[in-house]
Amino acid sequence: MVHTLHALPTTGDRLLVLALCAQWCGTCREFQPALENLARARPDMVFAWADVEDDAELVGDLDIDDFPVLLVARAGTLLHYGVSLPLEAVAGRLIDALATADAPRAAVAPAAAAALAAQLSGPRS
C-alpha cells in the first residue's frame, strides 16, 4: 500500500520509501503504478507518495527540479535522497540495496531532506 503523507503510519524501524512527485508531471503519473507494485512486494516497508505542491506544508523547504525524487529513510535517518529513473526495476534494486545494507550510508542531501526524514519517522497528529 502506498500512503499519503497525511495518512502515513508511524514507521519506527521500518524502511520508509517516499516518492516526491507532482500531479502535473507525466513521468510521476507513469511511476505511480510501479511504486504500488514495489509496495505490494515489500509489505515490511512503508511506502508513501507526496505531491510537492499539494503537500508543500509537509515537504517544507525542499527545492525539487526533477521528478520523481525518492527519499529513503529508516528510524528517522536519511539513507537516500535523489532523482530516480521512473522504472520499477531500477527503484526496486535501490530500495533492496538500502534495506539490506549492513550500516546506514550517509546521504548527500539538502538539510531539509534529512529534517523531513526525521519528522516522518515519528507519530503524527
Where are each of the predicted segments found?
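N-terminal leader/targeting and pre-domain segments
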Residues: M1-L15, G92-S125
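Residue-level signal for well-ordered alpha-helical positions
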Residues: F31, D61-L62, L94
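Short alpha-helical
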Residues: G26, D54-E57, P86
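Local sequence-structure signature of Cys/Sec-based thiol-disulfide redox active-site neighborhoods
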Residues: V2-L38
